[in-house]
From Swiss-Prot:
Family: Belongs to the glycosyltransferase 28 family. MurG subfamily.
Topology versus the membrane: Peripheral membrane protein
Upper taxonomic lineage: Bacteria, Pseudomonadati, Pseudomonadota, Betaproteobacteria, Nitrosomonadales
Subcellular location: Cell inner membrane
Record protein name field: UDP-N-acetylglucosamine--N-acetylmuramyl-(pentapeptide) pyrophosphoryl-undecaprenol N-acetylglucosamine transferase
Keyword Transferase set for record: yes
Catalysed reaction equations from the record: di-trans,octa-cis-undecaprenyl diphospho-N-acetyl-alpha-D-muramoyl-L-alanyl-D-glutamyl-meso-2,6-diaminopimeloyl-D-alanyl-D-alanine + UDP-N-acetyl-alpha-D-glucosamine = di-trans,octa-cis-undecaprenyl diphospho-[N-acetyl-alpha-D-glucosaminyl-(1->4)]-N-acetyl-alpha-D-muramoyl-L-alanyl-D-glutamyl-meso-2,6-diaminopimeloyl-D-alanyl-D-alanine + UDP + H(+)
Entries under HAMAP family matching the protein: MurG (MF_00033)
Lineage: superkingdom: Bacteria
């Protein structure tokens, strides 16, 4: 009889995509996988093509919207925990894995109530708020990076640094030495703004490149997101700078392999991909009032010599132009080496091993 894993992941692609990679690995080991998500996150678009059965909870957190929202959120949290507990009674999973998103808190508490071993993945360098609520209930806390958060203080016995799962085609990218072997001419800069486009990158890059003498300008590919592509093309044209502006990049592995350096945000999965691929980067983290995870990710990469951390408030055209002007292929190759040293290409397999180490036997365990 097959074992069952319940994966909890909701909200962003950074939570969902690694969960799908782990699901595929567990299925290859003979496990059944069921997904627990929310009614409004990206899991509703990303999970169905995989064919995984999915249960959705109506829960969207409790922070930042006044005491009435908090009170209502508490009631919804109790209700979501109850529904998750009933699901576990029905599925009788041997293990539960939390990948992040609002669903992990009620799902994690339900796992504790149902007596099912819980593992949580902390993709970022800093400990996620939702994971802080679950650390004491988890059998394993699996970290994407080996920063200070991975010590877990007095609960270090639960912590494992596994890395974050990345796509197979990223793992297969040639080494930095092979890629840089015959490169000549202008540097190749890849700007990645994500599906919605990072507006600070769109606003700054054309102006920064215009400050460079024409003979010193790099070859630029700028992924803008569909919403901003026309305005970005006009911005480059207005300052007389040539750039290949695209809404999306379908083959990201080839784009990574062709680039000397990326300019991008510092989400956990992006940083993990840069490390596994061995690509130098200028990281401009998104910092909002409720979280600084990207800043911590960027600092971690910079401290290891794998990236340049450029805080958004310091990202002026003048500062970026100076950074680009100072970069050489020799320096970028050294950064690419440092990034590659940080990569954990076997993260999905390592996480699968940890799940199997804590799993209940098919016929045993307490589910009450």
């Amino acid at each position: 009889m097959s074992k069952t894993l319940l994966i909890m992941a909701a909200g962003t692609g950074g939570h969902v995509m690694p969960g799908l990679a782990i699901a595929k690995t567990m299925q290859s080991r003979g496990w059944n996988v069921h997904w627990l998500g929310t009614t409004h996150g990206m899991e509703n678009r990303l999970v169905p093509p995989s064919g995984l059965p999915m249960t959705l909870l109506k829960f969207s957190g409790m922070r930042g919207k006044g005491w009435k929202h908090t009170l209502l959120g508490m009631f919804r949290l109790v209700g979501a925990t109850w529904r998750a507990w009933r699901l576990m009674r029905e599925l009788q999973p041997q293990a539960v894995l939390g990948m992040g998103g609002y669903v992990t808190v009620p799902g994690g508490w339900a796992a504790r109530l149902a007596g099912v071993p819980l593992a949580i993945v902390n993709a970022d360098a800093a400990l996620l708020m939702s994971n802080r609520a679950l650390v004491k209930h988890a059998k394993r806390v699996l970290f994407g990076f080996d920063g200070g958060a991975a010590t877990l203080g007095g609960m270090a016995f639960k912590a494992r640094v596994t890395g974050n799962p990345v796509r197979a085609e990223i793992v297969e990218i040639a080494s930095p030495e092979q890629r840089f072997a015959d490169r000549q001419g202008p540097l190749r800069v890849l700007v990645v703004g994500g599906s919605l486009g990072a507006q600070v990158l769109n606003a700054t890059l054309p102006k920064a490149l215009a400050l460079l003498p024409a003979e010193q300008r790099p070859i630029v590919t700028h992924q803008s997101g569909a919403q901003h592509i026309d305005a970005l093309r006009e911005a480059y044209a207005a300052v007389g700078v040539q750039a290949h502006v695209v809404p999306f990049i379908d083959d990201m592995a080839s784009a990574y392999a062709d680039a000397d350096v990326l300019v991008c945000r510092a989400g956990a999965i992006t940083v993990s991909e840069l490390a596994v691929a061995g690509v130098a980067s200028i990281l401009v983290p998104l910092v909002v009032s409720t979280t600084s995870h990207q800043r911590d990710n960027a600092r971690w990469m910079a401290e290891h010599g794998a990236a340049i951390h450029l805080p958004q408030q310091e990202m002026t055209p003048q500062r970026l132009a100076l950074l680009l002007q100072e970069l050489t292929r020799t320096r970028l190759l050294a950064m690419a080496h440092a990034a590659r040293e940080l990569g954990r290409p076997m993260a999905a397999e390592t996480i699968a091993n940890e799940l199997e180490s804590i799993a209940l036997p098919v016929q045993g365990g307490k589910h009450s």
